[in-house]
């Protein structure tokens, strides 16, 4: 199983900024706008030859962030390894006004609903093979 994500701002890909200065620029460009985070997932089983890819788009509307909010967020989270400089599972959720998608885990970076669907297609019976204590009691 592999997954990765890129932010799409009006057709322009915004990847992982890598440093503070690039993160500031990304967040300034996205403030007050809709951005689509495209999360790709792949399931490959070499033994059976199964391969499947899927894409989980997530539309996100950023708040109209002030420069001070952007600086405070970046100093606290340092999301320089996150597409679009936003880590929604942390303080990054405070940057957002709205999220639209069909898989709430996709924005975090691994669309689990799609991944489970792909694993079932590969013949993996997720619930049948769950060990005692796996939270399915």
At which residue positions do the language-model features occur?
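Anionic-ligand binding patches
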Residues: 1-137
């Amino acid at each position: 199983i592999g997954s990765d994500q890129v932010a799409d701002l009006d057709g322009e890909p915004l990847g992982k900024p890598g440093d503070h200065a690039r993160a500031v620029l990304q967040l300034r460009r996205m403030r007050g706008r809709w951005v689509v985070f495209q999360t790709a997932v792949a399931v490959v089983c070499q033994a059976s030859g199964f391969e499947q890819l899927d894409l989980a788009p997530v539309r996100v509307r950023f708040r109209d962030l002030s420069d001070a909010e952007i600086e405070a967020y970046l100093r606290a989270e340092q999301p320089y390894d996150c597409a679009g400089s936003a880590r929604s599972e942390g303080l990054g959720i405070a940057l957002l006004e709205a999220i639209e998608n069909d898989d709430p885990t996709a924005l975090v970076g691994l669309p689990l609903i799609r991944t489970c669907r792909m694993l079932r297609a590969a013949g993996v019976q997720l619930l049948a093979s769950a060990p005692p204590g796996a939270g399915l009691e």
